[in-house]
Amino acid sequence: MKVPNSRSGMMPPAGIVGLGSHVPSKVMTNEDWAGLVETSDEWITTKTGIKERRIADPDVCTSDLAVIASQQAIEEAGLSPDDIDMLILATSSPDVPLSSTAGITQSTAEIPGC
């Protein structure tokens, strides 16, 4: 099904057809934090609602996690990387300050059509 588009006249619909996620295996709890700074699990939980966070190894980048998640999403959707028209990645922790982590992910995951 095609839908109207002011630039080209018609365009295919967009949608999310697969989801993937990946987080580091190392867990840092509030008790771990309390051992490093003057605070407590109760204070952190009360003020932030956070009970634990995942910590990536120093040699693991955001795009490394995103590649695994994108491969899961593609597999879940029953597609191949060649079928992907767009990759959207939003992060507050990019691999490098002035390059697109989405572009790095696209290249590493071998998604050519974006």
Positions of predicted regions on the chain:
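A common structural microfeature
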Residues: 13, 52, 84-86
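Alpha-helical scaffold segments in soluble metabolic enzymes
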Residues: 15, 43, 68, 72, ...
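Phosphate/pyrophosphate-binding loops at sites that engage ATP/ADP/AMP, CoA/4′-phosphopantetheine
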Residues: 69-85
